[in-house]
């Protein structure tokens, strides 16, 4: 499908990036099209059998000194630790704290599942908001201990609703009881959690990355076939400045 699309993208960065990757990674000068797709496929697969096209081979060839992956705090970091102990890997590989599901209270079923995973990985029994915050902080500490200095966040719009702790506690309990939070409650809970995390990041002198305007899972068909983050996202067109300004201002209080 991509080979049929790429000839129509001349002038778009995707056209140039595609051919730069073919050239730089595989030494292939042929322009990608339906007529050349099979030939390029065969050439690229032959190259992938060579050591310099392995994961470590490519990192060495492009002189990558540091590589940061994006990682859900409810998942393990055992592979990062194994890589750190492998003297043959010259590239430093660190996790990046990506807690996108930490405020997903509008979908109680998925939120409960995620909290259960966080509970297991953090070894903290989560029965209320205080436990939840402690578990998030413990994962920040763990990421920091193995070299992480980055967090990464994606929002359709930045959170800019600032509830009391009591309100956040009630929203957490509502979702934990299997009841979906409404959009206003979800925005309030997201603001509360994000502000809490920002304070943790600041205390450890981390860099926080924010991606605004990502419109997720546009295609139900793709979502049902492959799940989230499988190519069904696009750029949103919601206003960003006012809410981002309000959030950054709140951080300074």
List each model region and its residues.
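Long, well-ordered mid-to-C-terminal structural blocks that present hydrophobic/aromatic surfaces
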Residues: 180-253
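Metal-cofactor-binding active-site regions of metalloenzymes
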Residues: 1-204, 253
């Amino acid at each position: 499908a991509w080979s049929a699309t790429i000839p129509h993208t001349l002038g778009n960065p995707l056209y140039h990036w595609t051919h730069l990757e073919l050239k730089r990674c595989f030494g292939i000068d042929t322009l990608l099209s339906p007529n050349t797709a099979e030939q390029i496929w065969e050439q690229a697969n032959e190259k992938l059998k060579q050591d310099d096209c392995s994961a470590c081979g490519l990192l060495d060839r492009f002189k990558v000194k540091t590589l940061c992956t994006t990682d859900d705090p409810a998942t393990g970091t055992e592979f990062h630790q194994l890589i750190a102990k492998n003297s043959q890997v010259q590239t430093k590989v660190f996790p990046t704290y990506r807690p996108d599901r930490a405020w997903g209270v509008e979908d109680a079923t998925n939120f409960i599942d995620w909290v259960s995973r966080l509970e297991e990985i953090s070894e903290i029994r989560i029965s209320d908001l205080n436990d939840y915050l402690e578990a998030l902080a413990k994962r920040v500490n763990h990421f920091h201990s193995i070299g992480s200095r980055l967090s990464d966040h994606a929002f359709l719009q930045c959170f800019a609703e600032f509830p009391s702790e009591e309100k956040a506690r009630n929203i957490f309990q509502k979702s934990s009881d299997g009841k979906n939070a409404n959009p206003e409650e979800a925005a309030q809970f997201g603001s509360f959690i994000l502000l809490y995390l920002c304070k943790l990041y600041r205390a450890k002198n981390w860099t926080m990355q924010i991606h605004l305007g990502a419109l997720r899972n546009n295609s139900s068909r793709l979502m049902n076939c492959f799940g989230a983050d499988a190519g069904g996202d696009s750029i949103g067109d919601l206003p960003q400045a006012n809410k981002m300004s309000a959030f950054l201002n709140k951080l300074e209080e």
